[in-house]
């Protein structure tokens, strides 16, 4: 039962952006929000955790919170890719979850994997976006890659790599400034 694997093994380090300066309970997704004043302290820790690693390629979400961390960590020329943006919460962006008067929100809470935010995406939509990016990345000759992105992207990359199941996603959320390592073979 020999299975032909056309892909080279690849190690991917995914870094979540640092803490955002948004009131708790506010849905911000793809909105370009400011970072907390603790950015430099948090980013210093992330950079220290990457020390000694080298990457064949570095990518980042185009949102400022990720570009700033990539730049701080020494990668100002990281390639920006829209597929690495956070979940698009559509009409709910920048509203408190407990103040959203949309009947669709209850459906989303009951089945966030499949139900789209009003005029936005579902978690499954975001997964397809991330899987498409990773499928394309696997065809490149890289052995070690860095990606500066968002909590949802890190979760979906772990699902793609078989580390977690979609139903476990939100209990596996990486802290701000945290790093997840996945291996693809």
Predicted regions span which residues?
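Active-site-proximal alpha-helix that buttresses catalytic centers in soluble enzyme cores
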Residues: 15-76, 121
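Histidine-centered catalytic micro-motifs
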Residues: 14-18, 148-153
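Domain-level recognition of soluble alpha/beta enzyme cores
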Residues: 164-185
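Short beta-strand scaffold positions
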Residues: 60-61, 128, 148-149
